[in-house]
Every structure is written in C-alpha cells, then in structure tokens.
C-alpha cells in the first residue's frame, strides 16, 4: 500500500503483513554504501558469518566488509545484525527515525529507561545473506525499512503448524528479558528443503512472500514467523512497537518468561483480555 493512514494502520495492525511503499521521509534515505563506508568505516559492528549451515558471531570494522562482500556465495556470506550500534553511534538513529505509523503509538518508551528495548536494529547484509526463521521477542509488531538494496521475505502466521520449524526457545538478551523463538536447523525457505516445507505449510496456513526496496518498509504482525534474504548488498533498519493492538501479547510474553525464571514466586494468572485475574 502507499500512504497508509493512521486510521487504516490501526484497523489493520496485528492481522496481516503489509508493505508500505511511500510515507517515509528521512535523511537516511540518501545513504549509499560509499557514504556509509566513508562516515563509519572505522566503527565496529556485530555480525554473523555463514559457511554452509555453520554460523559464527564476530565483530569487525565496517571497512572490512568492502573486501568481504566481493567474495560471497550462496553458502558463504556476512550479515551485520547489531542491536546496540544506535547507542554507540547516535547519529545513525537521528538520521533514521522509526516510521511515523509505528512511532505514533508506542508504549515501550513508557518503561523505565534501564529496561527499554533498543530503539532500532542495524541490518547490513551482503548478497545471499539471510536471517533465521524466527518470531520477534515479546510478540511485538515489527518493522523493517530498506535504505538501499533489496530484501525478500517469507511470513507465516502462528498456529499448530509451528512444529514444522523445530523451534527452540532461548533468551532474547534484551534489557527486559524475554523468550526468543527460533528455527534450529538453519532451514532456509529459499533452499530445496525449505520449498518443500512451504508446500506443506500452504496446506495448513497462509504463506506470504514479497520483497521490499529502498524507501519501503514491511510491518510484521505480532507473533508471526518470518525470514528475510538480501538479494544484493542491503542496508535496513528494524524497529518494533507495543501498541493498543498487541500490548496484551507483549505483557503475556513478559509474564511467561518471568514465570519460567522465577518459579518460586506466585504470579497472577494472565488472561488474553489483558487483565490480571486473582488465581
């Protein structure tokens, strides 16, 4: 859609993925790889290096990616996925604020500062790089804005078919801890095996596929499984929001984590209506 209004977004939110083609205007839309390299080539970023199904976490200066990106293959690539760089390099966030539709109603800033989530995630991937199949922490409503390059997507709603992904539950590592749900076998929806999984999934649930380019952003509904692949060198900024449509899921997911971590404490029963009931 183009020029989605606030009322239209409120009516949609939490139901289906949507690609917003226009309606975002910020200095970061002028960023290109060469400009980013000149400004932040000496900044260290957290990244993932892939060789086949092996993944290795590392950190390097951005300038090193200039050489690495020329030697990538479908089985060997690099993906910068840095949650904290906007705190270390504030001008990145200043030049690239969250999409207005998501920022208009966001309850996360109401939390105490020490447990607020990182406001944005810096994502810079070489050609062929891809995320895991995962669900975002807290079941928040996510966004992914492409500044340059192109990113392909597959999204699947939650349901009884979740076991197709062999999901593992780990800890998110965010300031306010939560569970993180992630496919464990390094499955790619774009692989031969992944296409077979999608064929089975389509018999049980809707599967959405699409792509976004410069200036476009995807809104990811609360609780949906998704995976992204970069078809060329691609810079994107991911964000999140807790709003009237998803705050029940966010609270429920927070309580679920702390119930698990603090078993000796008597927790109130949480109902999907968004209220705490006396046990």
How would you describe each model-predicted region?
Residues 1-217, 225-279:
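N-terminal accessory scaffold of Fe(II)-dependent oxygenases
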